[in-house]
Amino acid sequence: MPPTATLEDIKAYQQKVEKDKITPYNLPPCPRCSVESEFFKIHAYRERRFLIIIEMLIKAAYCSLVRFRCPGCDKTFTNYPDFAIPHKHYTRPSITGFSARYVESENMTYQQVVMVDNSAVGYPESDSTDAPTLAKTTIRRWITTLSNFTQTCRTAIILLLQENPVSNICRDLARLTVPQRKYKTNQRKKQLIGCRQLVIIEDFFQATFNTSIFTKLATRYSFS
């Protein structure tokens, strides 16, 4: 079963929000007027619904996200916890976990990815065979999203090589391929390889720095 953020993760972040412990320091400078994020001020709080997976069931959990405002031009920014990705209700561990299952397997299909022990991850009312489940098209969209984190991945590689100049990461990334039956266009091929590269970079980054590229790095580069 791919990992998921837990209720405890979300509750812990909510407590940080309530205690004013969320700062803008890991946000990028304002792209409009170049003011550094350390000068940003709290603008608003926005409730966000997250979908987590508990014992094969998809359940909702709620948490407040903090929006900061640039004092130079009034542009606003959302500070995301490391279990969140912009515009996605499912948590980052679920998104990366299910996506990795597909791109790292030569034979896995999208339909097989959403199945665990011959059962599909579904919603609490799934006593009916017609009840909604995690859709295979959702996995496809997640892979597309993760393939777009090019700046984050590029910077992560630089940091990894600075820490360990003899790292095998560049060699490992260069020889990545995907089965031809998994794509029909060169664009999709690039997206699949890009997602697979992110999965490998994340593993290297976790092993080297004991933290995720999503904790600060992805936020710093505006999830690009």
Regions from the PLM with identified roles:
Residues 1-12, 22, 35, 63, ...:
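Long C-terminal interaction/binding lobes of large macromolecular proteins
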Residues 1-84:
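Short, conserved DNA-binding cores of transcription-related domains
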Residues 64, 89-92:
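Intrinsic disorder
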Residues 82-87, 97:
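Short helix/strand-bridging catalytic loops that position acidic/His residues to coordinate divalent metals
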Residues 86-90, 131:
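Short amphipathic alpha-helical molecular recognition features
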Residues 91-107:
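Short, amphipathic alpha-helical "recognition" segments used to contact nucleic acids or chromatin
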Residues 106-141:
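Short, basic interhelical loop/turn and adjoining N-cap
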